[in-house]
């Protein structure tokens, strides 16, 4: 297995680069972000993943090992080939992909050209548990984190007129639509997200204690 290439950059194109290794030119496909870090005539290093097919062997290059790891995990999804996996990395950085996979955020993947809702749903389904954000706490710790911020958000909402029951239910429903907000655990952001969710439907705003007849 070729883990990385280091040598003089001989060429940088729109989708590939050529690394000169003691007179042998190795061509690698890479994202625009990775290619932008390579400069002709200078030493360059890319982490690589070798894809072997019946009639070809193709190298894909990455800025770091994390990017390569995400690429290879994406390849485990049925229907996702190396070009599509690379396209995902061209649109989103590895951590954003980890967060989207961890929170079940289909919309992140539909932003990638060539990925529709059906494929995005399959990616999220098949990546469940395979990609997690760096520093993600175990489930028990996540529950403990929620226990620390939720009472604060509920208290803020009750001060605005909602009952504790309605406030708690609204928070849960709002964050079900935007799970990445819950993951960050920022109280003001969670409050804004919940109030925005309530404001999207006039009927929801009627849940305030003071507005009941």
Curated annotation (Swiss-Prot):
Region (Domain I): 1-63
Region described as Domain II: spans on this chain: 64-140
Highest taxon of source: Bacteria
Primary localization class, coarse: cytoplasm
Chain residue ranges for the region called Domain III: 145-213
Record-level Gene Ontology MF annotations: ATP binding; four-way junction DNA binding; four-way junction helicase activity
Annotated Pfam families: HHH_5, RuvA_C, RuvA_N
Region (Flexible linker): 140-144
Keyword tags: Cytoplasm, DNA damage, DNA recombination, DNA repair, DNA-binding
GO cellular component labels: cytoplasm; Holliday junction helicase complex; Holliday junction resolvase complex
Annotated HAMAP family: DNA_HJ_migration_RuvA (MF_00031)
Subunit-structure text: Homotetramer. Forms an RuvA(8)-RuvB(12)-Holliday junction (HJ) complex. HJ DNA is sandwiched between 2 RuvA tetramers; dsDNA enters through RuvA and exits via RuvB. An RuvB hexamer assembles on each DNA strand where it exits the tetramer. Each RuvB hexamer is contacted by two RuvA subunits (via domain III) on 2 adjacent RuvB subunits; this complex drives branch migration. In the full resolvosome a probable DNA-RuvA(4)-RuvB(12)-RuvC(2) complex forms which resolves the HJ.
Stated family: Belongs to the RuvA family.
Function: The RuvA-RuvB-RuvC complex processes Holliday junction (HJ) DNA during genetic recombination and DNA repair, while the RuvA-RuvB complex plays an important role in the rescue of blocked DNA replication forks via replication fork reversal (RFR). RuvA specifically binds to HJ cruciform DNA, conferring on it an open structure. The RuvB hexamer acts as an ATP-dependent pump, pulling dsDNA into and through the RuvAB complex. HJ branch migration allows RuvC to scan DNA until it finds its consensus sequence, where it cleaves and resolves the cruciform DNA.
Official protein name in the record: Holliday junction branch migration complex subunit RuvA
Organism: Pseudarthrobacter chlorophenolicus (strain ATCC 700700 / DSM 12829 / CIP 107037 / JCM 12360 / KCTC 9906 / NCIMB 13794 / A6) (Arthrobacter chlorophenolicus)
Gene that produces this protein: ruvA
């Amino acid at each position: 297995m070729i883990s990385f290439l280091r040598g003089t950059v001989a060429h940088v194109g729109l989708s590939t680069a050529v690394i000169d290794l003691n007179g042998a030119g190795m061509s690698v496909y890479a994202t625009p972000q990775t290619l932008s870090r390579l400069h002709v005539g200078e030493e360059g290093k890319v982490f690589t993943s070798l894809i072997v097919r019946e009639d070809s062997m193709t190298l894909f290059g990455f800025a770091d090992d994390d990017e390569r790891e995400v690429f290879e995990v994406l390849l485990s999804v049925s229907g996702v080939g190396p070009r599509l996996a690379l396209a995902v990395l061209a649109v989103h950085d590895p951590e954003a992909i980890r967060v989207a996979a961890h929170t079940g955020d289909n919309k992140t993947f539909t932003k990638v050209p060539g990925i529709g809702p059906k494929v995005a749903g399959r990616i999220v389904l098949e990546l469940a548990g395979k990609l997690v954000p760096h520093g993600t706490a175990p489930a028990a710790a996540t529950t403990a984190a929620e226990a620390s911020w939720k009472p604060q958000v509920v208290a803020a909402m009750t001060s605005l007129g909602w009952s504790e029951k309605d406030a708690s239910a609204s928070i849960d429903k709002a964050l079900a639509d935007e799970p990445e907000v819950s993951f960050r655990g920022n109280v003001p952001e969670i409050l804004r997200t919940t109030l925005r969710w309530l404001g999207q439907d006039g009927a929801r705003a009627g849940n305030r204690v003071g507005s009941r007849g």
